[in-house]
Amino acid sequence: MAKNDKIIIRGAREHNLKNIDLTIPRDSLVVMTGLSGSGKSSLAFDTIFADGQRRYMESLSSYARMFLGQMEKPDVDSIEGLSPAISIDQKTTSKNPRSTVGTVTEIYDYLRLMYARIGVPHCPVCGREIKQQTVDEIVDKVLELPERTKFQVLAPVVRGRKGEHQKEFEAARKSGFSRVRADGIAYDLNEKITLEKNKKHSIEIVVDRLVMKDGIKSRLTESIETAGTLTGGLVYIDVIDGEELHFSQSYACPEHGVSIEDLSPRMFSFTNPYGACPKCTGIGSSLRVDPDLIMPNAGLSIRNGAIKASGWNYAEGTIAAMYIDALAEKHGFSVDQPVSELSDEAVNEIMYGTHGEKILIKRPKQQGGGQFYTDFEGIAANLERRYAETNSQYSRDTIEEFMSEVECPECHGERLNKAALSVTVGGRNIMEFCRMSVTEALNFVNGLELTPREAMIAKQILKEIKSRLGFLQSVGLEYLTLARSAGTLSGGESQRIRLATQIGSSLTGVLYILDEPSIGLHQRDNDKLIATLRRLRDLGNTLIVVEHDEDTMCAADWIVDIGPGAGVHGGEVIYSGEVSGLLKCKNSITGQYLSGKLKIPVPEKRRKPSDKWLHVIGASENNLRNINVDVPLGIFTCVTGVSGSGKSSLVNEIIYKHLVAKLNRARTRPGRFTDMTGSEYLDKVIMIDQSPIGRTPRSNPATYTGVFNDIRDLFSQTNEAKAKGYGPGRFSFNIKGGRCEACEGDGIIKIEMHFLPDVFVPCEVCKGHRYNRETLDVRYKGKNIFEVLDMTVSEGVEFFANIPKIYNKLKTLEEVGLGYIKIGQSSTTLSGGEAQRIKLAAELAKRSTGKTIYILDEPTTGLHTADVRKLIEILQKLTDGGNTVLVIEHNLDVIKTADYLIDMGPEGGSGGGTVIASGTPEEVAANPVSYTGAYLKKLL
């Protein structure tokens, strides 16, 4: 490699990197791989990307840098051959409710332009097409009437308005007109015209009366101009003994007078007041009090606490109880009946009140007795009013617990106002276009029939829309709709959307750094993704991809393996070169799995489903097609299927949310389904995802697993601590007493530098040890509390071998492959895969009831094949305890080791939503319709 076609890294020491030197080719597809926690991300993101970004930032003026987040220089001696860097990772999905697939990919911006330039407006009331016509066009149209036709030119000054309208008649008289037509009847303006005040009327001024013959063109033009001036552009031509013609010089319905402003792109923007629905301000939904959250358990009676809303609990003698008793008397129900037995009218009045109807309230004897009549506001209505009126954030937060998102009643979730939604291209409005899947949208755009003028205007716009839709298709996202909210996308989907957007921008000479773009992608769509990565490379860019997927590794021009282990045992370059060389590398675990020397074994026998099943009936959330699904309990089940087939809708939206509401009493609203049976065999549901175990530097594996409490208890039992009277709280860095107060137990102090990045320096008082001197003097087996937290988990296992309480928790962490992390390592430095395994370890350490269902969504994210092997062992262990494990997964190694599979499909989006196959992996592999089965066959 010549010097200018490579990136040379010298002395990289960020995180666990061990002063490594590395040379990689530019304009190539480079894959970085290695065990979870080996240092791949530290090299790719925290070193190469961070430095590329920092150098670009430093080329800007100090004034501009003030407004940008400052970048720290990574711990590296030098990097040569670096380009401006763009990182496409998992984490930066927009949580803005206004962000959609259309806005993120910029397709929506081009759509707004297209609808503004070639859209056809319609009347929002009657739906008829509205045309904008000049005076000359109107005159030419009228001149087409047959010779000798009698007609009059009318100016519609009042259309369907109540009133006597004497002002309008007076103004017409003063302007010199002599006739009007009111409600279809002709009147002379010299006579007195009386109209009913409370009826709607339509009034037209007769501007001129004409007979069609040669030479009337100039008089007709003048009359039409006069009529247009009086009405803002509306003109009626009343043909005697014929039909009436309506014309408009602006975008207005001649029938209803509803006018639409000139079409502009801002009119179709739901982030702009000109286009957004006035009710929901363009979000498409609003927060409303949800009766199902006020009374979540219809099996309870009101006396036993069916009503959960604060202030409305049925405690004898409260005003709430008096209202409920009055309603019970009115509707003939008892407060000891289950709510499910109450009539709809009764429940409706409990929620939304009596609408002004008075009910008899009886005051209890202990409150003085007596009775009075009053109306009742209703619990839901009361909460809505209090929510709207209160200024207290606490009150709003409390009431929000009983609210859920509901479709906006004005725009029905379409986000735009009526005028914008009445403009069409090819017979569809902009939101109907956005509701189509990418494939349908592409077919629609390709099939548009335009006039030569429209085709000329829209040529460039359509080219951009087609290419961007094509890129979304090429990264396997053809099932998404442009209206889909960006916040509902999975990490892999949002990353591939940004990948498609980058291809659309056609930059060259850029360094792209990607974090596992294959996440959430079925094997079937992998080839599309690889072709997309190559396309980005062929534009003249360098791609560094952190990836564990075998297909992507084999497609790389260059591969870098970081290892050999994880954490303190990693941080070295094991191999750097072409893929063929990695297969022969004896030191590389990756190479051994790639070449087939190491394999994850297929289990010799699988667990059989018992007679305990979870039956989901009529699941219809998102794209699910009213399906029935049976999930066996007590075994390890995997839900598979292509991206967008409905796996997450079934597992996360319906099964998890229903069970967490029922078993854990959480306030969530599950997706749409008819019924679910079998939950009586379960006592709790646990979702184990890759979200951080804590969001502050103070949370760590020790605090999450609870082992820190045991360690603090142990230190407080030492003779030294007892002599000084120290309790367990003395050894906490979160509360005053034992911690160093100079840094408040953080061990580091932040110094703001304004134009330069903030600098974090070790605390001068405690030297980064977090505790004060007296606390650090207390030792157990020669180590103080800071030194214990600074040990790796494996060191801790040896150190605490004779303290079962601590040993067991640390041993489980070691068993899940986390022996290398420090006991007190800050949770903000842990990867998603590490956080997930800490959660699994915490579960394994608990005493099992055998009635828990564990739900995991793509747990292999960020995991090397060797880590996947450990993960499978943990899942099998959890299942051995009699628990149920339900996993959504694309990784074939996990799929082949499951006891039972539920394969969704056949396609994504509108082409999915059904169960294609279910049974053991062998049974699914034998199914000719299943895509998953076809790939499984090769492994079994």
Q: Which ranges hold each PLM region?
A:
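Conserved phosphate-binding elements of NTP-dependent enzyme cores
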Residues: 1-940
